[in-house]
Amino acid sequence: MIENLIIREYNSSDEKKWLQCRLISFHDSAYYDDVYTKKPVFNNSSLELVAELNGKIIGILDLEKDSEDGSICYCKSGVGAMIWTIAVLPDCRRYGIASKLVLKAKEWSKVNDVNFIEAWTRDDKWVLDWYESLDFEKFHSYWHIYFKGDNAKSLFDSNDKDISPQSVFAHSNKNPKTLDQNKIDRFYKCSGYKLDITK
């Protein structure tokens, strides 16, 4: 299937296909509602790749080198680069396309004096297993929690009666299983992974 696969740099004319690839690729994952309407623009050195097959974008990767003040990567052991997006269309998985994108990211990182690649993901086991198969190591985790309706309102302290929050997305170090489940709409464990490329 991938004999004609081309991995190349993203260009602005790819944006619509890039957005479609990301949307469809995330649809069967825990990030199904993390929808972009515009492709992000990066302020620091970055690698933006697309995997193209017969004119169709079937995979994408965005990697950004950490800023001088270290405000992008959570890890502080050297210079890092963050994978903001990596995705492959469901029908095109199991052909090693995502792994090829990561290999390109490693090559770019070595040339650009990056010591490690960092990535964050939710608790899809198949995604976690994939990162670990590439020698990424988990270094931290926390929780994404969603509240809706009256439960969202109870978290929002405002004297403005014209504001009525209907949904709240929160980061938490507290396991949501210890909270009142009737107040939570849904939650995910978000884990940080790190690939040391100095070895």
Where are these regions (language model features)?
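A short beta-loop-alpha structural element at the N-terminal edge
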Residues: 3-18
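A short, internal acetyl-CoA/4′-phosphopantetheine-binding micro-motif in the GNAT/acyltransferase core
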Residues: 86-93, 121-122
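Active-site rim helix/loop that mediates acceptor-substrate recognition in acyltransferases
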Residues: 23-72
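Conserved GNAT acetyl-CoA-binding A-motif
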Residues: 109-121
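Conserved beta-strand-loop-alpha-helix junction that forms the acyl-donor binding cleft
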Residues: 118-128, 144-150, 157-158
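Conserved acetyl-CoA-binding loop of GNAT-fold acetyltransferases
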Residues: 132-142
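Conserved acetyl-CoA-binding loop-helix of GNAT-fold acetyltransferases
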Residues: 94-107, 132-133
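A conserved beta-turn-beta hairpin within the catalytic core of GNAT-like acetyltransferases
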Residues: 66-83, 93, 115
